[in-house]
Amino acid sequence: MRIPAHAVCTAIRDDIVTGVFQPGARLTEELLARRYGVSRVPVREALRTLESEGFVTTRRHAGACVAEPTQQEAADLLELRMLVEPLAAARAARRRTDAHLKVLRGLVRLGQERARQGQGEDLRALGGWFHETLSQASGSPGLISLLTQLRHKVAWMYAVQAPARPAESWAEHGAIVDAVARGDAERARALTAAHAERAGEAHRMRLRSGGPVRTSQPAVNMSSGLH
């Protein structure tokens, strides 16, 4: 059975995001085909997609390599996500379905439970699912696509961690869901913007304490994204 290029693309992207392939690393079709058990055709298609997304660059005489983001690109990326996510929340308040609301509330319950138990690994995944579902609830394909790509890139460029105060973070998630459930677009926007700003401030504090971003430059002080 032929494995589709989008599945290979997801696998390569995941390996880039998690640091299996470091910035600047060569990505040969032969190596990737062997790693994922596929032919070189879907690998070639996947690399083209990842290049269009900014995860891969093509170098003369070297071929495809993992991109090497600059400090400014990493900072701009986080700021862009902080601007776009409140818009998605406002649209979610107007367009969400009962199914979206059920999933969001379920994630908040799980997140609050895991926060009490101190299960950081689970919280990272749950936070990602929460923000993914919130963007899906916006009903805006362009926003959904943009935020999905931004989340991938934030996770790639920054050493994404669970929030320092998980109970507070998940209380904020719960308040956002309440606003979405009531159809209060402006409150959903404001709460999401405040949530993003607090996450951004926590990020800036970690910048000063020295967590590295995945770039080709040494000693870059950057760390996590939004939660």
Please annotate each region the language model reported.
Residues L77, D98-A159, W170-A179, R187-E197:
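Conserved amphipathic alpha-helical segments that form helical-bundle/coiled-coil interaction surfaces
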Residues A93-R94, G139, A162-P163:
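Short helix-capping/hinge motifs at transmembrane helix termini and TM-loop junctions
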Residues M1-A90, R94, R204-H227:
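Short linear motifs at protein or domain termini
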Residues R35, P163-H227:
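C-terminal regulatory/effector modules of DNA-binding transcriptional regulators
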Residues V20, F55, Q119, D184-A185:
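Residue-level recognition of short, well-ordered coil/turn positions
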Residues D15, G19, P141, L150-M157, ...:
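A short secondary-structure junction motif
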Residues M1, A5, R81, T97-H100, ...:
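Generic alpha-helical segment signature
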Residues E51-T57, H152, A164-A167:
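Mobile beta-alpha loop/short-helix "lid" or hinge segments that flank ligand
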